[in-house]
Amino acid sequence: MKKTFIFLYCVVLFISTTLAVEMKKTQDFNLRIFDQHPKYNNNFEPENGVLTVNLVKSILNETTGIPELTTMSNLTTVNKQGRIYSPELFKYFFADNSDAPDRNNSGKNYPLDITLTMNLDDKSNYFYDNQEFFPIDGRGFDVDQQFRNYYDDESKANPKPYHNYHFCAKITNSRFTYKGFETFRFVGDDDVWVFIDRKLVVDLGGLHIAQEKTIDLTKLGLVVNKLYVIDFFYCERHTSRSTIRIETTIELQCPWYDFCGVCTGNGLSCCNVTRDCDDGNPCTIDLCPEPTAVFDLKDISANCRHQDRTPTDWSVTDKCNTGKCNVSTGIFVTNITKCIPQNSCKAEDHCDSGLGCIFKNLCTDVCSTGACVDGKCETKNSKICIDELDKGVEDKCYEYSCDPNVGCTKKPRCLQKSENYNPCLNSFCEVSTGECKNTTIPPNLCDCQCDGKLNKCQIKSCNADGSCKPLPSLEIDDKNPCTIDACDETTGVITHTLSNKCGGCSICNGVTGDCDPVDKKCDDGNRCTTEVCLLDKATNNGNCSSKPTTECDKGDVCMVYSCDTEKGCVETPRVCPSKGKCQVGKCVPGVGCKYEPRVCKADAFCLVAECDEIVGCIQFEKKCAADNGRCQAGICKNATATEEGTCESVDFDPKPFICKTAAVVSVGVAVGVAVGGAIALGVFIFAGKKGYDYWKASQGVTMATSNANPLYESNPSGGENPIYTSPN
């Protein structure tokens, strides 16, 4: 007897000091429900239909996270069979559209949240079974009595109570660690779609009586110990039944909760934008806090977000409007940009919506280049006139200058002046040096009598016979084809008048006499435009034309080239916008913007870091797959300073029914429940078998059979059970 008590003591000590791992008895999930009504969505309460597969695409949209129809035409067979009368409203089956107008077929819905609890059965399946599944009776739209007008089909002959028959529900973004044996079974009506790893695995679309589908996850090519996403979508679209049964061995995990405590929620179950976030400013868009924000719920209003509204009256590329929102009315007031000249070379002209401020160029006189230097018009000097008249090649026998009346001119360097004219000298220029030289003309050829025969515009010259031969003054012809030369015979005043043959931004070429366009005369003071002078050859008139400059673009696809109307070209690295929360934009040289998955880093071995399309990077508890997932739990141990993190397998206690064997009396069989093992044996030690029977009844411990008391069990392996007393 003494040995027996020592043995029992050791068993009690072992049980009381060993970590007990028990299968979760329940799993709670947030069911996001979207109350629908036939008034707002005619895809609800249509004619009875049939089971329709391929109604939705086989891959879940990664950005929206909801199913998409395979076709958007209501004339296709699949949509007709699936009773999708208005395909454009399908997107509101599982997405908030509570702000839609209160009119027929607006797609308006009413989001609600409930908790769905799945229980563990004796076969280690989690199940939910409800053959009268009406979770939002009297809620949503049906708070208003006028919407409570749908009853069971049998209501006339056998009156039954009202129910809310029109709603869709979803459990999305839930995770599970694949253990290698899981199954999923659904029985119910109407539409049901289940996606695992964004791939459609249960396809029970359409209006139909209860249908069944079982999925063996071992057939899906999943990898043991890898984390997967599961998304569940369900709709009830027609009277008179609403049934649902779910059975699964999948152990789901919520990756994150919103500030309302809702799994993968958006915060709208406890935050109402109108009630909680209205800042009274019509120029802002009011939003509830970020879903994963952490704060005391009484401080929701203090954590709301407010974004500035942007104008919709004009294009954001309009360079002339800098409209502001009137905080009193919420109306954007057009504010034309004032174009203020930055220097004395320009005058205000107008604002172009595509180009910005355009200024009038004041540097347009004949001796201005059209350019503005240090705030002043640049004047043509001899060098500029050489460029203009002789294409940059100086003729040393001429002097170049700009005449305010005619523009650039060149005059012979060695020409005798009329007032000192000596007809017996022949003045000429040495071309190579520009040196002036004279040769003497014989007197008989130059010294003739011209007295009284010359007017003020003539000079003395002699014929070979010595008679007078008046010649025009040498200064009358300025050798410029662009001027009209004249001399007053009474006064001797010589004038050179610029011909008006060239107009606008063109000038007359002093060498050829042609009209040449001058782009500089079109400078509009906007550094983001390229100005050209276009010559109309029929009229010899030059017209200015401005267009956005192309000089800023250097061809690097990873740089953004822009232009500031005052500063000129600006270069900034291209920022590729992210796509959703989980695709990061990256610029690849020579290619441009590409997307790559956002990398989220876990802070510990026993945390999983990944990206969620709703909130971005998240971290949550790592679930390890056990060696024998049916009978063991995977336990995660974080890394230490000396050891790496590991996953270990620990037996369930009590063991699930399928794991019990006849080889030994397991702790689970012996005790019934892990936490009560030591108590049960202690009761037996001090109270005997009858005491244990009383304890079992008082605790409500569930046993497989009426003889499940371990005190009645002999060792089937032939050994001695020290706590077994034969009934004989």
Swiss-Prot record:
Keyword Translocase included in the entry's annotation = no
Q: Which region is the signal sequence? A: 1-20
- SMART domains reported for this sequence: PA14
Q: Which residues are glycosylated?
A: 61, 74, 104, 272, 326, 335, 438, 543, 638
Query: What InterPro entries does this protein map onto?
Result: Fibro_Slime, PA14/GLEYA, PA14_dom, Prespore-cell_inducing_factor, S_mold_repeat
- What keywords tag this UniProt record? Glycoprotein, Membrane, Signal, Transmembrane, Transmembrane helix
The residues on the Cytoplasmic side of the membrane are 688-728
Give the Extracellular compartment stretches of this protein. Answer: 21-666
What protein does this entry describe? Protein psiK
